[in-house]
Regions:
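Short hydrophobic/aromatic segments of transmembrane alpha-helices and their interfaces
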Residues: 16-17, 155-156, 400, 613-614
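An often Trp-containing, charged/polar helix-loop segment at the C-terminal end
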Residues: 466, 470, 521-523, 569, ...
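Active-site-proximal C-terminal subdomain of hydrolase catalytic domains
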Residues: 458, 463-494, 500-501, 505-507, ...
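N-terminal low-complexity, intrinsically disordered patches enriched in charged
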Residues: 28, 422, 472, 569, ...
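Gram-negative bacterial Sec-dependent N-terminal signal peptides
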Residues: 1-36
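Glycine-centered structural positions embedded in regular secondary structure
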Residues: 12, 509-510, 570
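Substrate-binding/charge-relay-adjacent region of secreted/lumenal peptidase catalytic domains
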Residues: 38-159, 165, 170-461, 492-496, ...
Length: 642
């Protein structure tokens, strides 16, 4: 669930009233002249788009030009004042460097998971990957020198040489990347974004791929769904697709191992699992300890690893990380170690959370190479991720994970086919307004999008179902998760703050940017040229979700694809433990084996993930709602051992 952040307005003492004229003058300074250096583009394009021709303002009172964001539909910014970001405003940037020998890397990634190949399941160590495919030390040194020359400090280089992070300010970014940055209010909080592309000197053109950290207007949001009775408007009438004796009820996290036939496998005590998070994990670990004590499970060996330098602040909302950790442990029966790879968020309002800090966290999980399976219950519109460069940057991280035999599992999203559309307070899946009697749609219902990083070909994308059981632990049926329409923007008590409405449904569909991997085209047909998601799906409905501990309070019923991915991670950790942590990214095997071995699956054939006859409709076999469906983990494990 995306929640509104209540941002504290704090001003540094250096912006005291006496210094205000100087600060204003600094923000209006022109971009440095480019004559001395030949500048070339990176993948990081302008995130803030002007809808008016560039023209010098003749008076201070001249109206501001209209702006839009560089995401699907280029949503216009309304009722907000767009001004230059003060040049002294601190920024944390991450420069993403290009891999070397990319053709060889792509060939290796194909072969390492291809039975019969000489490289089959012969994974690389981080040192081996660095030697063969990472940027050279000389290339890194050139980037570091450029950052230093433009005033950046606290420069750090990732262990795999692919990320160079640094602290500076908007003025340093303007000098170093020719990047103009604006500030404005969006989704109820003050944010910033670049309104020009990030450029680099031509001498770095073959080295640098993108520059992250130039915007914090669009970052991945949490994908959990908590019950709010006042929010319901048009709930879908869901067919149980099961026997008359079945029911749709909430579950303890330990129930899912039985429901999906993982409980017969040994607990995943030979496997280390990671979770991508942000901020402080103190409350999350306390809640996890309460859960394991109540469930009769062993206390979990946990660790918190910061994705980069900076503050891991408590933002007061541990629900997402509680859902992830408790359902992974409940489904897995226990793990060797649970590592929280936490992105720097800066403060209690998450104002320091950017595309840069999240990519840093993904990369830290890969360079550590300790976690076999890594959960990501986060997502955002993939057009936004492509615009700022993080889509390609994250793909590069996930490629190294595949080469090392690590598995990233990513939630497919909770906004159905409308990941791109957001409410006034930033909730995805926005479709229109409610006047008390009927819904008035205000978007193009035929425009679809998918969530990043779930759309990456180098991860397992996990969609959502509505689960029916006999009792609470015997699988009886699943349909596509689609709860219909609800109020989008809620206060802390779960009451609507405006008349905006959204859908709650599993993400799924066709990527606009990611090419279909060969194994997907081979299984689904030559017409599939772009990556389609999800690959598999598990329980996500709030009504059939998990009872977890949040802020010390037990029996909090939560759903979303943030539940579905941890169920897969917990079950897959058992499969990995039973197979010596040797299976690697399983998607190519899924697409090779599942079409002809349906006994390994629970096929989902009913429901859709849109609104008012839009979206994708489930069918026999693979579909854009639930992929191949949910797994019978014991049968998949036995098949994997052959």
């Amino acid at each position: 669930m995306q929640r509104t952040q209540h941002v504290k307005r704090t001003l540094s003492q250096r912006f005291a009233l006496a210094a205000l004229p100087l600060a204003v003058a600094a923000t209006l300074a022109p971009l440095p002249a480019q004559a001395a250096t030949n500048w070339v583009p990176t993948r990081t394009t302008a995130f803030l788009l002007s809808n008016a021709p560039a023209a010098a303002a003749s008076t201070a009172s001249q109206a501001q030009p209209a702006y839009s964001l560089n995401s699907v539909g280029t949503p216009a910014l309304a009722d907000t004042h767009v001004t230059p970001l003060e040049l002294s405003q601190p920024l944390h940037v991450t420069v993403v460097l290009k891999h070397r020998n990319t053709d060889q890397l792509d060939a290796f990634l194909h072969d390492v998971n291809q039975p019969g190949s000489a490289s089959y399941h012969k994974y690389l160590t981080p040192a081996q990957f660095k030697a063969r495919f990472a940027p050279t030390d000389a290339q890194v040194a050139a980037v570091v020198a450029h950052l230093k020359a433009n005033g950046f400090s606290n420069i750090s280089v990732s262990a795999n040489n692919t990320l160079v992070s640094a602290d500076g300010n908007a003025g340093n970014a303007q000098n170093g990347f020719q990047a103009s940055i604006k500030r404005f209010n969006y989704r109820g909080k003050p944010v910033f974004a670049n309104d020009s592309a990030a450029l680099i000197p031509a001498s770095l053109g073959s080295i640098v791929d993108s520059v992250l950290g130039l915007q914090n207007a669009a970052v991945p949001h949490r994908l959990l769904h908590r019950f709010a009775p006042a929010a319901a408007i048009e709930p879908n009438r869901i067919s149980k697709n099961a026997t008359a004796a079945s029911q749709q009820v909430g579950h303890q996290p330990t129930d899912f191992a039985k429901i999906y036939d993982a409980s017969g496998l040994p607990a995943a005590t030979n496997t280390t699992v990671g979770i991508i998070t942000w901020g402080d994990m103190t409350q999350t670990i306390a809640d996890l300890n309460t859960f394991t004590q109540n469930a009769g499970l062993a206390t979990v060996n946990t660790a918190v690893v910061a994705g980069g330098s900076g503050t891991l602040a408590d933002d007061g909302d541990p629900g997402e990380w509680d859902l992830d950790s408790q359902d992974i442990i409940g489904t897995s029966g226990g793990v060797k170690q649970l590592i929280f790879y936490s992105a720097v968020n800066g403060d209690s309002s998450d104002s320091g959370l950017t595309d840069a800090t999240l990519t840093d966290a993904y990369n830290k999980a890969v360079t550590d190479n300790k976690a076999t399976v890594i959960n990501v219950s986060l997502g955002l519109d993939e057009t936004a991720a492509n615009s700022d460069g993080s889509l390609a940057a994250d793909d590069a991280v996930f490629k190294q994970a595949v080469a090392q035999g690590q598995v990233f599992s990513v939630s497919a999203g909770d906004a159905g086919v409308y990941q791109w559309s957001t409410s006034p307070q930033g909730a995805p899946g926005y479709i229109g307004t409610y006047n008390g009697t009927s819904v008035r749609t205000t978007i193009n219902l035929s425009k679809y999008s998918v969530s990043s990083p779930a759309s990456s070909p180098y991860v397992v994308a996990v969609g959502g179902t509505t689960l029916s059981t006999t009792g609470t632990t015997t699988w009886a049926g699943e349909t596509v998760w689609n709860e219909g329409v609800a109020y989008a923007d809620l206060d802390s008590n779960g009451n609507p703050v405006d008349n905006a409405v959204r859908i709650w449904a599993t993400g799924g569909g066709v990527s606009a940017f990611e090419a279909a991997p060969s194994w997907q085209t081979a299984a689904l047909g030559s017409t599939v040229t772009k990556r389609v998601v999800p690959d598999v799906a598990f329980d996500a409905a709030q009504s059939t979700g998990a009872y977890i501990v949040i802020n010390g309070q037990t029996n909090q019923l939560v759903g979303g694809t943030s539940l579905a991915s941890p169920i897969f991670v917990g079950g897959w950790a058992r499969v990995e433990s039973a197979n010596n942590n040797s299976l690697g990214l399983p998607t190519s095997a899924f697409y090779q084996n599942f079409p002809t071995n349906t006994s390994l699956l629970h096929d989902v054939t009913s429901g859709n993930n849109g609104y008012s006859s839009h979206g994708y409709t489930a069918k026999a076999g693979w579909d854009d709602d639930t992929g191949f469906g949910s797994l019978d983990f014991a049968k998949v494990s036995a098949s994997s051992a052959k």
